[in-house]
């Protein structure tokens, strides 16, 4: 990956958009976005996935989703509205910066989940390869809309890398594609889809909703294998 692809948790000189409303619980609302897609159904014959942290504390059960037999996923049918929310938040940021509340030179940071995040959380493992390319196309379309609407030199984009980290630590069931290959290919693709004028970062996280570790692993996992 190019040198501009950082792995810092925060980007110096930026202020992040506020996550409220449906985004208060990060990407949890994407479960319903996927369930509402005409090509996806609830896998009622498959046990729900229990989202729990390392000590067994459980936060919720997630009904598993799958692609309907014979259906074809289409990026045009995915409606996350990330671009709309970012552009709306930008207007407030821009006004506050013009008023001097936010210092000049501070960039507006837009944080987005990777396509792997809702896929690993919600889909049956066998259908991951069907959904990831579709979500990738959709999310890069959202990035393109943001890049066209906002001044690229005044914004920063952050791909939140969480599910990839806990997958690397053995949290998820294996799928048909090795998660290491899937992760590396995905992070490169979504990074390459961000215009060069936009500052880009990849923060790595394995925190639960309780701000504790999801995995019990104490030894850092090498991403160079």
Language-model-detected regions and their locations in the chain:
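Aromatic-lined carbohydrate-recognition surfaces of secreted/lumenal glycan-active proteins
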Residues: 155-160, 198-212
């Amino acid at each position: 990956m190019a040198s501009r692809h950082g792995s810092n948790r925060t980007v110096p000189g930026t202020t992040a958009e506020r996550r409220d409303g449906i985004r208060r619980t990060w990407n949890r609302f994407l479960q319903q976005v996927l369930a509402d897609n005409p090509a996806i159904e609830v896998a009622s014959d498959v046990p729900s996935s229990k989202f729990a942290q390392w000590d067994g504390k459980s936060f919720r059960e997630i009904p598993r989703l799958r692609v309907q037999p014979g259906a074809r996923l289409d990026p045009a049918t995915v409606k996350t509205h990330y671009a709309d929310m970012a552009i709306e938040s930008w207007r407030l940021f821009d006004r506050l910066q013009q008023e001097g509340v936010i210092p000049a030179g501070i960039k507006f940071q837009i944080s987005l989940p990777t396509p792997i995040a809702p896929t690993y959380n919600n889909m049956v493992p066998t259908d991951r390869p069907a959904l990831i390319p579709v979500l990738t196309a959709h999310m890069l379309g959202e990035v393109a809309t943001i890049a066209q609407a906002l001044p690229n030199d005044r914004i920063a984009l952050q791909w939140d890398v969480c599910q990839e980290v806990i997958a690397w630590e053995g949290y998820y069931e294996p799928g048909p594609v090795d998660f290491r290959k899937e992760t590396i290919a995905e992070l490169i693709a979504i990074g390459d889809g961000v215009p060069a004028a936009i500052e880009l970062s990849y923060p790595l996280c394995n925190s639960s909703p309780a701000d504790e570790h999801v995995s019990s692993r104490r030894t850092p996992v090498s991403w160079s294998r």
